[in-house]
Every structure is written in C-alpha cells, then in structure tokens.
Amino acid sequence: MGNSPSYNPPAGISPSDWLNLLQSAQRLNPRPSPSDFTDLKNYIHWFHKTQKKPWTFTSGGPTSCPPGRFGRVPLVLATLNEVLSNEGGAPGASAPEEQPPPYDPPAILPIISEGNRNRHRAWALRELQDIKKEIENKAPGSQVWIQTLRLAILQADPTPADLEQLCQYIASPVDQTAHMTSLTAAIAAAEAANTLQGFNPKTGTLTQQSAQPNAGDLRSQYQNLWLQAGKNLPTRPSAPWSTIVQGPAESSVEFVNRLQISLADNLPDGVPKEPIIDSLSYANANRECQQILQGRGPVAAVGQKLQACAQWAPKNKQPALLVHTPGPKMPGPRQPAPKRPPPGPCYRCLKEGHWARDCPTKATGPPPGPCPICKDPSHWKRDCPTLKSKNKLIEGGLSAPQTITPITDSLSEAELECLLSIPLARSRPSVAVYLSGPWLQPSQNQALMLVDTGAENTVLPQNWLVRDYPRIPAAVLGAGGVSRNRYNWLQGPLTLALKPEGPFITIPKILVDTSDKWQILGRDVPSRLQASISIPEEVRPPVVGVLDTPPSHIGLEHLPPPPEVPQFPLN
C-alpha cells in the first residue's frame, strides 16, 4: 500500500500495542516513510530478543530504545508517551503475562491529532486487497477492525464515494446494509444538531460537501462518522454455515438439511438463502458426491444434486442382517452389476465424473476426413444435412431435434374405426375442421384447412384469433427457407374435430401465421387421431381413335443409329 505499514503485529507485541505505535508514527513531521516502519519493526524484534518478554507501554518507554540505532523510533515512543499521559492512563497496555485468560481486551488508542493530511487519491486494487487481507481475521465492528481502517483512511483521504467502494469490497451484503443504515442515521443526527464545523445546510448535505476537492475538515468529520457507523456492526462469525462439511458416510439430504438449519439460525430475515445452499451443497460435499456432480457442475439445482447423489451409498454402511431359519437356497433373479465410477479424469476433457466414451466433448472436434456422403470436410457423417428431412417445421433454429407429441386423448374403438381414413380430393387436399378454444374468434368455429404432411405442426392465420393472444416468436424452416419474424407460437390449447359430433382432440401448441395466408392441418392432428390419409385414384375414360393413314415407321426405325463407344472389357 505504498507508504502504508503492515497492520499485522510482529512477534513480541500485542495487536493493540502495535496499532498504538503505528498511530504515533503517523504524527511524525515530516510524514513517516517505509524506512520508519521498518525501523519500528526492527526495534520490536530487538526488544523481544534482548528483554525476553513482549513489548508493552510500561516496559517499552522512550528510554528503552538506544539512540541513533533505530532512526526516529524514540520520537514515536515519546509521542505515544505524551498522548497517553494527557489521557491519564495507558489504554493500549497489554494484559500482564501472569494473568491467565479470560481477561478484558485492551482498549485502542484514539487518534487525537491527525497532523498534516495526505492528499486525496483513489483506491488502487492492490490497496483494497491489502486492507481486506488485514481485517479478514478480525470481527466486523471490533476496535481492532475500526482502527485498522482508520490507519488506511489516513493514507488516502478518501471521499464518500471511495469509502462506499471500500465498504463494498471488504464487507458482506448484510454488513453493508447495516453500516449504511447506521451511517445515514448518524449523518442526519449530526446535521440536525448543528455540530459539524464548516457545514452549510444551504449548499447541500454533508455527503455532497465532503466530496468537494477543498472539503478539508468536513471530509474528516464524514470519515469519523463512517468509522463510528462501523462500531454498530454485530460482532459475529462471518459465515458459520461455511464450516459445515458433509461427512464421509453422511447422505446428501442430511447434509443439505444441516445447511438449511444453520442458515435459518444465523442469516437475517430477507437475505436469500438459495444461492448459499446451491454453492455449499457442491463445494462442501464429500469426495464421492463431488465426483458424481462433476458432470453437472456447481450451478445445478439442489434438487438435481440430491437426485444424483441419492443412488450413491457409503461403503462403510453395511446392510442389515435378517435372522432366518436355515432352509433350501432358492435361486433368485440375477441382479445387474452396479456401474463402477471411472478411476480417474476423462482423458479427453480432463474432468472427473464420466468415462471417455460418454464425454460431451467427444464429437466437438473436427472430423479426420471429409464426409463420405457429400464430401464436405466440416462435419461428421452422422451430421450430414443430406440425411435429415428438409421440409419440416423446427422450433428454435435449424438444429433443434424433432419433437414427438404423445397421444393423450383416449378414443373408443368405434371412433377409431371412423377416423382410420381421411378422404381427400386430388385437386385440392382440404378438409373441413371444427375448432374451439379460448383465443379463437367466435366466427371461426368451422373452417376449411389444407392438409400438409410435410408440416410438423398445425398453422392458423392470425386473423382467426383475438388480438391479445399469448405469443412466442418462432423460427420455422419451410420450402422457402428459414422464417424468423413471420410465425408465433400459441401456447393456449385448441380443441379440434373433423366431424360436428366429434371426437374432439386437444392440441397444446399451434403455429400462428402473422401474414394471414396459411391454414394448414399438420402431422400432429393425424398422429393424435391415429388416422391415415387416403386419396382416391382418378379414373380416366379410355380414348378410342381411328388411324386414317398408317405410319410409315413403327418402332425405332426412324431414330439415328447409336454411336459406337468402346466398352471397358469385363474380363
């Protein structure tokens, strides 16, 4: 952090005494340099080595430092002695060595005079990382936590925006909310009591005025209020639920149940618990469950993780033995051998949890040669477009799989006999259809629709429906290419029948033509009716004629002789 010292105390001094020495060093004039902090640390090492005891305020006065050996360390000790003498005590003194724990923690020396303020500069990422590293093992809101942040603030003179950035980097979302609430109340109380020096209510709030370049004392007062708001943070473990780890023989359900109980007891109301459970159910799981979940990844839902790990049984759990009388041994059904997990990571993707034959990246690489069907070197034979059907409706793009709609309507045998054949005319294959549904116009209860066996779904024109029908854009592949802006999906059900008396079938998904051109009966209707399409043969009357003059050539005599081409010998 530039000229900033290390807030972690060296060997031979307590954290409170080390913070007091650092605050005293900040009062040096001129300002302390990195060499001053190095001399201070070397002095503590020398004192602990020579005196055979830790440094305290009572044992390490200004006379304990040899002159001329540790630079300006005697001035630091004299400043500390002067401040503590004015305070009338030694709040930073450590507990005696012979006093056993527990004992009250020592108080931290408050800053009386900050001396010459440093110029403002924005936080660097390295500084934020160092500050977070120094306070990560300290309880939020404790005296050591507050004074460590105070020393960091003295180095950069941060604005309110910089302090907000620091709070977002070092504090949890729960602590950020509590700190902001306390800070807002403290600023409002200070502005109402008119105790702020240099504050003018007509020019804006304290936050706005302290952000100005020439704020001076106003910024210092805002920083003190920001630090005081940190004292109201609850001193609790940062995340007690993070220490819950799944045991070697513990089931996933019991492990997730313990996580939920810990979150319910320690997490405040209103804070979402699902992201924490999703993360820890994978990160703190045992080795066997992590190998099973490796293919799903840490972003899978908790329910999917529990289902995946439910089939795994711990090795040290033996099945219960049933006491039975001896008798003849009867052969039972042969049980399939259990699938053993792979011994190591997949050699294709270097991930654990699956064999190389089941690797999802198996077919993502380039083929070794061109396709044997179309000679295209960019795809495998199984992905050749010439093997796929061209004239079909596909949702979501050209590579989406074809969906097969199951038959959910139960039809009687008499109804099936009536619907086994749909007669169509050869000139125009249309059929009369009786429609009903919540999104259909009342006048469109009967219509003539074109039967298209190349269409996977039924298509209705948009003017048959009401204006506010639920729609989802669809990409459709037809004979003219891909249409992405013309068709919509209607998710509402549509009841359809080929006869007024029924039977009626329900189609859950229909394509809507926004151009009002097509009314097509797709393959989904015959598949649900289990019907076939029959087109009668067109019978033409025979043509009888009389030849006036017989032709001069009958057969192939009038054609020219074929060219003589030498053939490849068969032998």
UniProtKB/Swiss-Prot annotation:
What keywords tag this UniProt record?
Answer: Aspartyl protease, Capsid protein, Host-virus interaction, Hydrolase, Lipoprotein, Metal-binding, Myristate, Phosphoprotein, Protease, Repeat, Viral budding, Viral budding via the host ESCRT complexes, Viral matrix protein, Viral nucleoprotein, Viral release from host cell, Virion, Zinc, Zinc-finger
Positions of the record's site feature: Cleavage: L109, P110, V323, H324, L420, S421, G545, V546
Lipid-modified sites (N-myristoyl glycine): G2
Q: Name one GO cellular component term.
A: viral nucleocapsid
Superkingdom field: Viruses
From the UniProt record, give one GO term of the biological process aspect: viral budding via host ESCRT complex
Keyword check for Lipoprotein: yes
What Enzyme Commission number(s) does the record list for this chain?
3.4.23.-
Q: Sorted alphabetically, which InterPro entries does this protein's record hold?
A: D_retro_matrix (IPR003139), Gag_p24_C (IPR045345), Peptidase_A2_cat (IPR001995), Peptidase_aspartic_dom_sf (IPR021109), Primate_lentivir_Gag_pol-like (IPR050195), Retropepsins (IPR018061), Retrov_capsid_C (IPR008916), Retrov_capsid_N (IPR008919)
PROSITE patterns given in the database record: ASP_PROT_RETROV, ASP_PROTEASE, ZF_CCHC
Task: Give me the disulphide-bonded residues.
Answer: none
Q: Which PANTHER family does UniProt cross-reference here?
A: ENDOGENOUS RETROVIRUS GROUP K MEMBER 24 GAG POLYPROTEIN-RELATED, IGE-BINDING PROTEIN
Kindly provide the name given to this protein in its UniProt entry: Gag-Pro polyprotein
